[in-house]
Amino acid sequence: MELPFAEAWKIKMVEPIRKSTRQEREQWLKEAHYNVFQLKSEQVYIDLITDSGTGAMSDRQWAGMMLGDESYAGATSFFKLKEVITRLTGFEYIIPTHQGRAAENVLFSYLVHEGDIVPGNSHFDTTKGHIEGRRALALDCTIDEAKQTQLEIPFKGNVDPKKLEKALQEHSERIPFVIVTITNNTAGGQPVSMQNLREVRAIADKYGKPVLFDSARFAENAYFIKMREEGYRNKSIKEITREMFDLADGMTMSAKKDGIVNMGGFIATRRKDWYEGAKGFCVQFEGY
């Protein structure tokens, strides 16, 4: 039997949390009018709303904040960030933002216009908001099995190729790009298979459409591929990650998820036209 190793880190800092009584919780819920979003964070023992920005950062990350170059232009911190992103993803053009929804705002300000249709797999709420706020339509093309909560299949986050093809057949001139969320957050954080990503790429290429990944949990998706998809057991997460991103034209990223930082995000792409078109909106919304 193969035994698991201990975690590869030491914990240097702890934050105390308080375990409440049932009577207290009942009172707090009553005071919040039974709207859990009105509870105070200190009243919640285990918060299951999101993991976003809640991961513990390493000593090197905290030290990096003290050593970071905050120059308005030409900051060395940017070039370090760019080198890492390009090494991991293969994307050449990088636009940093303060979080994932900001990356969507910057990129969609260039790509999405009134009357457009953006097909994908269960758009995340901010993604849908940025699309529909521009009087466009976020078209859900997720497989039907994703809604069957008792069904267990390896990749319930997949795009339905038939739904995607139908959308492109009927509305090709109104579709600026196809978006794939990895993992599929809105559908329970379910993963997307490499085979499905290949199918999406092939369909998009058939109609001359670019593919964008919402990549907040790309490393988790790569892990699921390694564990569940045939032919990937002996590949590293980095190898699987590069193979995934080779099937996309660009990505938006909330680094507060698989980047395991408390704040941050970015746009990365291999398309110079996306970069040139979006960077002006970055100055407008996010800074130089």
PLM segments and residue spans:
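Short glycine/proline- and acidic residue-enriched helix-loop micro-motifs
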Residues: 67
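Conserved PLP-enzyme active-site core in the AAT-like
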Residues: 2-55, 61, 70-94, 98-288
